[in-house]
Structure formats: C-alpha cells, structure tokens
Regions:
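Glycine/serine-rich phosphate-binding loop and adjoining beta1-alpha1 elements at the start
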Residues: 97, 116-230
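N-terminal cap/recognition module
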Residues: 72-113
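General beta-strand structural signal in soluble alpha/beta enzymes
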Residues: 161-165, 188-193, 236, 259-262, ...
C-alpha cells in the first residue's frame, strides 16, 4: 500500500489541490467509507486505485465570448470535467452560476460518479458549466451565451461519450438553446443532452424526478423504523425544481412541508404549504425570477431574512439548496428540536461535522449520492427513449 494511513492519503489530496476545499470534503467522505476495503485489497493496492479515483480522466476549460443586448461582448469561462467512464459514458449536469470554479465542479463530478453508479445504470460521471450568471439576463442574452458555450462543448460530448444535463441556472430553456445549436452543428438529432422539453425528446417527470425521488427515498428510510411519512412536519430549503417537487410529493403523500428558502432568507408557513401555494412558487421562480419573500407577503406568513430554516421544529429535514448549507450548529438545532430524518436533495449540503453529528445521534440520514439520484435515473430513461423513439407515459415513469 502506497499510503500508511487514511490521513496520509487525504493529506496528499489537500497538498495536490490546495485551493479546492469542496473537492477535499467530497473525497474525505468517500474515503472514510471505502478505506478499509481499498487498503486491504491486494488488487486495489497493486493498481493504485485510490489515487486513480480522485483524478479526472480529463478537464476541459474554454473561453465563451457572447454578446449582450447592447452589443457589448463579454467573456466567461466554460468547463467540462469528464471524471470517470469506467462503467459508461460520462453523465452529469451543467451549472451556470457566478460561484462556479474548478474546485466546485470537481467535487460535483466526483460525487456524480458514485451517484450514477448507485442507480444501477451503466453511466460514468462528469460535470460542467460556467461562471456566467443567467439572473437578470434577457432570453436573447441567455441564448447568445448558450450558443457560444455549445460552439466549443460540442467537440467533447456525444450520446456514447458524454451526455450533459441541467443543474443550477440551467433548465429546459437553456438545455433547449444548447440542444438546438448542437443539432445545427452536427446535423443530427441524438440524445446528447437530457432535461429537454417533452416536445423535442424530453421525458415526462424529468423536472420532477429529483424532488419526487428524494421523497420516495425518505419513505423507504422511514419504513426501516416502521414509520409513515403521513402527518409529518417537514422543513425544506431551496425553492428551485428540487424543493418545489419535493414539496409537491410530500403534499400528495400526506406530509406537511412548512418552509422554503432562497439566498435571501426563508419563509415559515406553519399551516403547511399547499399545492396551490407550490403553483405560485413555480411561477414566482421560473417566470418572474423573484425572491421567496414574495410568498410571505402574499400568504401573510413569517419571512426570516438572511437565515436558513433549520431552527424550525420538524420531523424531517430536506436540504435542497446548495453545498454546505447545513453546518454543525444547524445539525444540533435540528436534532434538539426532534428531527429524526435528514435526506439530502442538494449535492453535499451538509458539512462533514454535521454528517458526523447525524450519524452519532443515530437519526435516519440519507446522503445526496443516494437520496437525490432520482434525477439521473430519469435521465437514463430519457436517453433510452431517445434511442428507441418510444415515449413513456407519466404514470410509467413515476411508477
């Protein structure tokens, strides 16, 4: 064995990628789980598997020049990290957000490798995106950027090579712009992107898949203690696709979601978020791109500015916003208030200390790699539908 201890290996990762703290955290989480197996397996040691799984197959970085509505040219960075294709083509989302950098995308791509393998589908892992911020941009500006982004990305993707999808800042609209440009360049209609609209090759239930899958996962977790989700109070962070559709499925199954959040703060609706209110949130976020505080004004509920919802008493907590949104203090507050189920709708939303606290308290904890894999599972179904040209019904996909 090249490394004498787990600490020595993790220290080598930090030394090699000193500025990529999110990547360090993702690697540490996985290594804690597999160290004994990897360190005591002669074949794994001989072929240095540990070093190999933390280094991507390739990292692609490119310039993305685009034009705004005033004919000014802007330049952003584009990335695609093709991390591992041991069991299938690279698969993972594209994120458009000003926080995007190499460290964040490496952590997301690394997580994606294991998440995809847990679905049982033959998919490798990758991730990509740009530091472009779609907020406040017109449709024409977003289209200009997406065309420019695909003008370079098309060289590196394909239905048997790498199949990107959406993520933060990349919904059906952005996927549509990129898919149209890819189709124009290649003169071929192939399943090279997932998350497409249902009128042009997308799958029913794809927008809902991660949120629905998260709740189904919670239901199965609770069965291990012979508990039902019906009547349980649930705190949810975020207000994007995952949070919206998690709430939708919670309502359908008889649970009571009471919070939603965004980067400005959170709302607390103690009477419960209803389907009518979720429809309002969908329009609020996807059409108006407005803040969740508008919900508080419309429904006369409490809005807590600059805070996260983990102080609210609940049975179940679903962090669905972003990485490291739930720290040790939040974890202690949750368990102190009686929360006994935490399932991650976002990627690595809990800090390492928070995860250790959940495990030590013996609550039901569902890590994101498993709990939010519903999205990539339905992406696999979309890929299959694109290959066979046979669409599936909503009931078939949700079943």
């Amino acid at each position: 064995m090249k490394y004498k201890s787990k600490k020595e290996f993790l220290d080598s990762v930090v030394d090699n990628y000193s500025d990529q703290k999110e990547f360090h955290q993702a690697v540490e989480e996985v290594i804690h789980s597999i160290w004994n197996t990897a360190a005591n397996n002669e074949e794994y040691c001989k072929f240095n598997i540990l070093d190999r799984i933390v280094v991507p197959d390739r990292i692609i970085i490119f310039r993305v020049p685009w034009m705004d509505d005033k004919n000014n040219v802007h330049v952003n960075l584009g990335y695609r990290i093709q991390f591992n294709s041991a069991i299938g083509p690279y698969k993972g989302g594209l994120r458009f957000h000003p926080s995007v950098n190499l460290g964040i995308l490496k952590f997301l791509a690394f997580e994606q490798v294991f998440k995809n393998s847990l679905t049982g589908l033959n998919l490798g892992g990758g991730k990509g995106g740009s530091n472009f911020d779609p907020k406040g941009k017109s449709d024409k500006e977003i289209m200009s950027f997406c065309y420019a982004f695909m003008n370079e990305l098309y060289r590196h993707i394909g239905r048997r090579t790498d199949i990107p999808a959406g993520d933060i800042g990349v919904g059906a609209k952005e996927i549509g712009f990129m898919f149209g440009q890819y189709k124009k360049i290649r003169n071929a209609f192939t399943g090279v992107l997932t998350g497409k609209g249902t009128n042009w090759g997308g799958s029913l239930i794809r927008p809902e898949a991660t949120g629905y899958g998260l709740v189904y996962f919670v239901v199965e977790m609770m069965k291990t203690r012979k508990h039902s989700i019906k009547g349980k109070t649930v705190t949810v962070s975020g207000s994007g696709n995952v949070a919206q559709f998690a709430c939708e499925k919670l309502i359908e199954l008889g649970a009571k979601p009471v919070t939603l959040s965004d980067s400005s703060g959170f709302i607390h609706d103690p009477d419960g978020i209803t389907q009518e209110k979720i429809e309002y949130v969908k329009k609020l976020k996807s059409v108006r791109s407005a803040r969740i505080s508008e919900y508080a004004k419309k429904y006369n509920v409490e809005y807590i500015k600059g805070k996260r919802p983990w102080s609210i008493k609940c049975d179940i907590a679903l962090p669905c916003a972003t990485e490291n949104e739930l720290n040790l203090d939040d974890a202690k507050e949750l368990t102190g208030n009686g929360c006994y189920v935490v399932a991650e709708g976002a990627n690595m939303p809990s800090t390492t200390d928070a995860v250790h606290h959940f495990i030590n308290k013996k609550i039901l904890y569902g890590p994101g790699k498993a709990a939010n894999a519903g999205g990539v599972a339905i992406s696999g179904i979309e890929m299959s539908q694109n290959s066979t040209r046979i669409p599936l019904s909503r009931e078939k996909v949700d079943g």
